[in-house]
Each structure stands twice: as structure tokens, then as C-alpha cells.
Amino acid sequence: MQITDVRAIQPAGNNSPPDWRTSLGQILIAIDTDAGITGYGVGGGGLAGQHVVKTVLRDLLLGRNPEQISQLWDEMYQATLAFGRKGIAIMAISGVDLALWDLQGKREQQPVVTLLGGTPGTKMPTYHTVWSTQDLATSGEHAGYKLHLGKVAAPEQRDLMVSSIEQARISIGSAPLLMVDAWMKWDIESTISIAREIKSFQIEWIEEPLSPDDLAGYAILKEQTEVPIAGGEHEFTADAFRPLIEQKLHTVLQPDVNWCGGLTELIKIYTMAKQADLRVCPHRGCEIWALHAIAALDPQPLAETGRPWMTWVKGQPDIQEGMIEVSDRPGFGLLFDEAQLQLVN
């Protein structure tokens, strides 16, 4: 089997994200073969990511054997090394890598979860991300809930955040997990202070309180906070996760399979984390791409759900009673009609 074409588009759906995600949004990559099989993957980088796929990566992949996934990943990384290593180039590679895995599953008539040693139909608990405590009332049944918070600019804002977190715990009761997402907008002092005040609310983790580049800051938090710290959503490649894992700067690692380098790199991250006795909980885990890895590789499966960014993706399993089931269809189990996709201008 040989690759005959590599295509990339940026679809739009009814709930397509606004602002920066419109231009740096998710891109759909299709890899066609002479066997008549097409593999699909989703990466990031918007129009810039498309350009990387359609030029550098397409030139490298045409005529190649799509079954050599690991070798092709290494070659794509080398081909983009001068302008890549993180960000848009790795987001583009992520989508191509996922398309190659989708092809592999379709060729073998197996779901990706089976290729990874897991079982189709595996059910996993979910946690739901909300942007306010008011959203909790309409979030449905889940094993946990994550409250997305903003920047701490003044002491009174800190008090308001602590109060919001307390209200969230009261709202959901004592049984469900409760997480807090700072989205890289806190500082060391605020994180230590807030962590101290919310510890009694049974917080599963504080997510990304600092910039992903502030490893020194995370080292301080590791020593001075008792609430677990999660992060890695905005990190790229297994090599970049290595210091986080070796220094145990995060208790919970959150790679995004559509950004971090694809499934090939996510497998490496899981392997390193297991050796270090650290937990992996992929970002956007309920989306069809990450579910197969979570079902096959995760001893503590927990899948994140939230706003439906990729509404043009069909075949996504439904959440029922707080559980989600991995597909048993070949590949990732993606279903859609290419001719019906809307494109971002």
C-alpha cells in the first residue's frame, strides 16, 4: 500500500470556536492510498497548519508505505525541525499521525483500541468542564466536574475564586470529583494561597496554574502545595514531557493527542508516566481520537468532555449515565460525508 495524496482542510460546524481558534483551529487531514482506503486525523494550527501539511509533509509522504508510522513520524519531525519542535508544526504532524493510525485500523479491519491491546466497547467515566458554577446545573451526570477560572489580579478576586470553588463543591455534592482549571493565568503566590484555602473542598487537581514554560515555578509548587497539580495540555512531543515526568512537576499529565504529536507520541508519554508512577489524563479525552488510547493504556481511565468544538465529526459515542464507550468500528470509527463539510474561509 502506498500513499497517493495528503489533503488538509479546516471544517466549520454550528458551534465552531470563536476568536483565535478560528485561525488556529482544528484541521482535518485525509491520507489517500492506492488501496482505496482513506485515513482521517485531526490536528491543529488552522491555515498555517494546513500549509505545513500540504507542502512539507505531503512532499515527504507521497509514495510512502503508511504502515511505517513510527519511521514516518521521525522523518516528519526532522523535516520540520528548523521551524517546528513545538506549536503549529507538531500540531500538523499530530493530525497526520492520527490519519496513519486510522489507516492502519481500517487496513486490518480493527478499531485503534484493539491495535493498542485494548477492548472495543470499553466504558470509561467522564468529567465535564464548565465555565461557571451556574453551568453545573445543566451539565448532566458525570464522575467529576472541572471549573474553568480566570486571572487572579487582586486579593478580592482570589476570595471570589475560592468562594466559587466552594459553591461548586456544594452544588455537586461530596461524591463527584472536582477539578480547577486556571488556564495559565495564576502566579506562584496565588496558586499556593488558593491551594491552601481550597484543600478542604476535596480538589482532585489544579490545572495549569502557571505558564507551561515556567518549570522553575512548578518546582516550587511541587514543594509548597498539597493539592495535586495537572498540566501538559500545551506541551509538545514526548521529549518535552520528559522533564515534567523525571522531575515529577505534575501529578497528572494532560497531553492533547491532536497537538502533542499524535498517538505515536501519546503512547511514549504513557510509557514514561507509568515508569514514574504518574497519572495521564489526556486533554479533551472524550473526543474520538483520545478515547482509544485511554481505553487501552490508562489504568485510571477518565475522559474529559466540554464544549463540542468539532461538531462536524460524526460517530462520536454518546455519554450515558456519566460513562462513554469506545467505538468498535475500524480505525477511530469516524463517520462523516466529505462533500457536506463546511470550510473556514
Describe each PLM feature range.
Residues 1-28, 46-49, 58, 62-64, ...:
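Motif-centric detector for short Cys/His coordination patterns
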Residues 1-11, 20-21, 34, 282-345:
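Flexible C-terminal active-site loop/helix
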Residues 3, 36, 57, 96, ...:
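Conserved, mostly hydrophobic/aromatic
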Residues 32-107:
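Metal- or metallocofactor-binding catalytic centers and their adjacent structured scaffolds
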Residues 41-42, 146, 178-181, 204-208, ...:
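Short catalytic-loop micro-motif centered on adjacent basic/acidic residues
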